[in-house]
Amino acid sequence: MKKVLILGVNGFIGHHLSKRILETTDWEVFGMDMQTDRLGELANHERMHFFEGDITINKEWVEYHVKKCDVILPLVAIATPATYVKQPLRVFELDFEANLPIVRSAVKYGKHLVFPSTSEVYGMCADEQFDPENSMLSYGPINKPRWIYACSKQLMDRVIWGYGMEGLNFTLFRPFNWIGPGLDSIYTPKEGSSRVVTQFLGHIVRGENISLVDGGAQKRAFTDIDDGIGALMKIIENKDGVASGKIYNIGNPTNNFSVRELAHKMLTLANEFPEYSETAKKVQLVETSSGAYYGNGYQDVQNRVPKIENTMQELGWAPQASMDDALRKIFEAYRGHVGEARKLVEQS
């Protein structure tokens, strides 16, 4: 029976991963987070050992459980672009500095470290598909703090790789725009405070206009969370050590759409649901600049598509969900929350 340590267990990936582990395996989950709102009843499962805490404070608990568990997933990170621009030091301190002692504990106790890199590490790479073995990692100038997240993650990737040269059993995985229920809160009216799909859904729920940054031409390969978790489960299982010392892109190249196309898809799908259809009719698409939306420290990536051949072949995995199916699941999940989210408009 595997013991899996998930730090950030209440986060988007953490709670979906915990659910899959508890439903489909006999593994035990040891989880830490500061809240349980996404976990809900999972926090009370007999194989879920939850501790309410903070990786920057409860360091002894973390080290003890790194020693106790077989597989370590440090999922705690800030991953919202608006924060990269406005609070770059906060991003670096949490995403790199706070996670480094956890990496070193995995080295110390000889554990399998499964670390969340990011599709952002590829930066403004010009390749049609981003290759974890060969693509260049290219960023903008220092006066664009938007790149602090990508730099922090890339530096950690390189540190982990270095420890791998000295014997650390590790796997780096790079999620490409994973989407699904629980990504961010639809209750947040402030633009830029959540990631694009949740932001757009919140606007649709409240009948607000959707801002397309720089026209919404930038494209992303969106990935259903259940597909992403499927690959992650294979990595944690690590049958015959297949994932050891590897870097995997986890994404769906066929779901490559522009942000403008995403907005149109979501508005079309909203008409299938009575809870969303009336407010969706009020929504207009308006164009804005990245400077006005995020601040002058922002730069964008125009295309971000993963090369996933090694992920598919080595893990025996393939993404299944179409873009419409992935979005429809999100609309379904939030149907019961629409009334509460609308109150934000009435109160403002």
Predicted feature locations:
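C-terminal substrate-binding subdomain of Rossmann-fold SDR/epimerase-dehydratase oxidoreductases
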Residues: 204-348
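NAD(P)H-binding glycine-rich loop region in Rossmannoid oxidoreductase-like domains
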Residues: 55-94
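Active-site "gating" loop of Rossmann-like NAD(P)-dependent oxidoreductase/epimerase domains
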Residues: 78-90, 97, 108, 116-149, ...
